[in-house]
Amino acid sequence: MANFIDRRLNAKGKSTVNRQRFINRYKQQIKKAVSDAVTRRSVTDVDKGEKISIPTRDISEPMFHQGKGGVRDRVHPGNDQFTRGDKIDRPQGGSGGGAGKGDASDSGEGNDDFVFEISKDEYLELLFEDLELPNLQKNRLNKLVEYQIYRAGFTNDGVPANINIVRSLRSSLARRIAMSASKKKLLKESEQELAELENIPGTKAELILDLKAQIEELKRKIAKVPFIDTFDLRFNNFSRREVPSSQAVMFCLMDVSGSMDQATKDMAKRFYILLYLFLTRTYKNLEVVYIRHHTQAKEVDEHEFFYSQETGGTIVSSALKLMHEIQQARYPADEWNIYAAQASDGDNWADDSPTCKQLLEQKILPLVRYFSYIEITNRAHQTLWREYESLQQHYDNIAVQHIRQAEDIYPVFRELFKKQAV
């Protein structure tokens, strides 16, 4: 009985190439489904795969089929009513989308959609396609390189600690074979000749003695071939490779004053998670600093940032001051790519908004790569929005956007991080 072993790279019954063709062909429909899925998902599920549903009419293929006109000769099975030459009425069926009788058709409306699943990587690839980190400039960070030691074959010289015994013995064997092969062949022939001469009566003793001397000389030369020589030694070679140090820090600043209800906080959290996933696809090392503020700001962990019930009044500048202090103490601007995302409902103590502008203008914007401010509210903008908006006229690394409902989160995110025209 024959046994077949499937050694294909793709899973049984699947084709990665065809899958990628399908995704590329219907990318617009899939991207729309991905965009819709972002608003439906819970915060904890935002980075998982997704079931994509595409209307059947969007994936229909051109096909040849019988037209509605013309004269046709057919033989219908089970005919007991008509004979050749009879004329019958054309069946009044639907256009292929219903259950009526009639000819098949590729038109008509149906309710069944084509549903398939995309993986987490495919989902994130579509989610962040055509996006980039704004104002990503080369500074000292790109000159700070780490050296990674890696194996680089073998070399003929090195320190004893790096000697490769197997390679050295293999080289020794090859050298000994090369240097003694001809002598061993000649020795074997000489020994055979000596045995034949000794079996022949009347052979001259001088001839036998000369042959024995030749054999001894060959054995001496073969024995003089050293077992191992410095020429045979092989050492493991190690080389250094430059590895650019790619590290970034993201400051998440969230207003938790009494005016920020749980729904508003949840929308802010969705935005932060999208930003985190986006940055992790660019940087290997990403640190996140969570700062909550009402009248006072405090650095917290992730759980407390999103779920703490602490609340109070609103002084936004306290968060900006704390962010600057943490950045100065732990994240030098010449070694880190610094990003910040601030979410608020825009409700701030009126006298504090100019202070926020001053902090951004003098201490924060000169150091950060990008500062994004999203205001989540259905009310009219207040002083904080106007102060932040005025900074956009002088700085290209700050952006302010308005979110009214959950459906606005993903479009706003794409607007903040869309690729800039060259």
Curated annotation (Swiss-Prot):
InterPro entries, alphabetized: UPF0229 (IPR006698)
One Pfam family in the UniProt entry: DUF444
Transmembrane feature ranges: none
Region Disordered, annotated ranges: 60-111
Biased composition (Basic and acidic residues): 70-90
PANTHER family named in the record: UPF0229 PROTEIN YEAH
Family per record: Belongs to the UPF0229 family.
Record-given protein name: UPF0229 protein SO_2883
Biological source species: Shewanella oneidensis (strain ATCC 700550 / JCM 31522 / CIP 106686 / LMG 19005 / NCIMB 14063 / MR-1)
